[in-house]
UniProtKB/Swiss-Prot annotation:
The keyword Cell membrane does not apply. One of its GO terms (cellular component) is cytosolic small ribosomal subunit. GO terms for biological process: translation. It holds the Pfam family KH_2. Belongs to the universal ribosomal protein uS3 family. It comes from Streptococcus sanguinis (strain SK36). This is Small ribosomal subunit protein uS3. CDD domains: KH-II_30S_S3 (cd02412).
Length: 217
């Protein structure tokens, strides 16, 4: 069977930037585990805040965490209370000084993470998987995407045998390196087990001269 390379990993260094911007030699493994802990903690704490990408930069005993979110108000909280509490928890988790940047995603329908999360939450609320995918595709195309492809895998409608079913509209040129393709996968916890949701969104071409660190803005 044909296997597909990760669309974002294939474009890193060409039209996409790294989500972790630091260099280390002996401390590499420690920093990597710390990055994973930060990402897991933030996604758990801000599960309802429409968090997409988490970028991490490092200096000496300092960690800069950039959160791309469609709901910046929810992340910041009243008078900055939520973001201050999050910063304090991350300081305790890492033992370092953590600085948090909040970047608003102005067009969430062009962000694969948020579209996939929306489909997954609908599946958990027992919305039909075909309907959830088709509605997401319509919203994304209306938002200005050149193409979108979605796929839901697992025990669809509670079937005994797991299968995959997907839909697409427009073009999604996975082999074109200058094509700005956002990709994400999410999980939906249903009464019949987990369903996997994959989303590919083609947002147009990006020339290597002007790298797109995070689209949808």
């Amino acid at each position: 069977m044909g296997q597909k390379v990760h669309p974002i990993g294939m474009r890193v260094g060409i039209i996409r930037d790294w989500d972790a911007k630091w260099y280390a030699e002996k401390e590499y493994a420690d920093y990597l585990h710390e990055d994973l802990a930060i990402r897991k903690f933030v996604q758990k704490e801000l599960a309802d805040a429409a968090i997409s990408t988490i970028e991490i930069e490092r200096a000496v005993n300092k960690v800069n965490v950039s959160l791309h979110t469609a709901k910046p108000g929810m992340v910041i909280g009243k008078g900055g209370a939520n973001v201050d509490a999050l910063r304090a928890k991350l300081n305790k988790l890492t033992g370092k000084q953590v600085h948090i940047n909040i970047i608003e995603i102005k067009r969430p329908d062009l962000d694969a993470h948020l579209v996939g999360e929306g489909i997954a939450r609908q599946l958990e609320q027992r919305v039909a998987f075909r309907r959830a995918q088709k509605q997401a595709i319509q919203r994304t195309m209306r938002a200005g995407a050149k193409g979108i492809k979605t796929q839901v895998s697992g025990r669809l409608n509670g079937a005994d045998i797991a299968r995959s079913e997907g839909y697409s509209e427009g073009t999604v040129p996975l082999h074109t390196l200058r094509a700005d393709i956002d990709y994400a996968w999410e999980e939906a916890d249903t009464t019949y087990g987990k369903l996997g949701v994959k989303v590919w969104i083609y947002r147009g071409e990006v020339l290597p001269a002007r790298k797109n660190t995070k689209g949808g803005k």
